[in-house]
Amino acid sequence: MLKITNLSAQVENKEILHLISFDFQSGKNYCILGKNGSGKSSLAMLITGNPKYEITDGTIELDGQVLNEMSPDERARAGIFLTFQNIPEIPGVKLFEFLKSIYDAKAETPSTFLSFKKIIEPLMQELEIPKDFLWRDLNVGFSGGEKRKIEVLQIKLLNPKYIILDEIDSGLDVNAVRQVAELLETTNTPDNSFIIITHLFEMLQNLPLEQVLVLEKGVIKQV
């Protein structure tokens, strides 16, 4: 369970969340709604450990383990995954290198070139991602839909416990939104949970939701 208790936080001495409490149950999906500036993305940043965001009160726990002082990498290894609103392009880093590095960070022993190739290529085939993408610079020249497919590929590869989708529909046309939603459905299992931050209900049609939270000015107004 991802448990948030009396969480307050600030950025540059400005309060952004005030006494937020909620339990995200394992294996269930949730949606967070709210206007721009309501605190939706701030909550995602706090869960994943973005150092720009300062917790002033309360705790974030994952399966009984307090995350407050853990680094973003430690939280990722514990099972937290975040998609980005604006996916960065990283020239000089091949997709294969990036995927292997994040896989090895969670593995007990590092994979070899050939062993990882055998792991990643079937997953790419499932998502209809061309194999030659592995040897391209990370996200450079990729369309919005292709970048989102790479994020779905990471979810399949890492099997995180809690997957936070922060405006994953950003920059996508209607057809691409529908396609990404269908791909996400294939990654949703009884062992993981999606926390979806979105304005578009198309993203919600393929995933069964347990609850919808409404944030307003850093406070939960409706559940």
PLM feature spans:
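Conserved structural motif at the start of ABC-family nucleotide-binding domains
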Residues: 2, 17-19
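Q-loop/switch helix immediately C-terminal to the Walker
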Residues: 86, 92-106
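ABC ATPase C-loop
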Residues: 155-156
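H-loop (His-switch) and adjacent beta-strand-loop-beta switch element
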Residues: 208-223
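Helix-to-loop junction immediately C-terminal to a conserved catalytic motif
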Residues: 48
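Walker B catalytic motif
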Residues: 167-168
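ABC ATPase NBD Q-loop/coupling interface
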Residues: 59-75, 139
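The feature captures the beta-strand-to-loop junction immediately N-terminal to the Walker
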Residues: 33-35
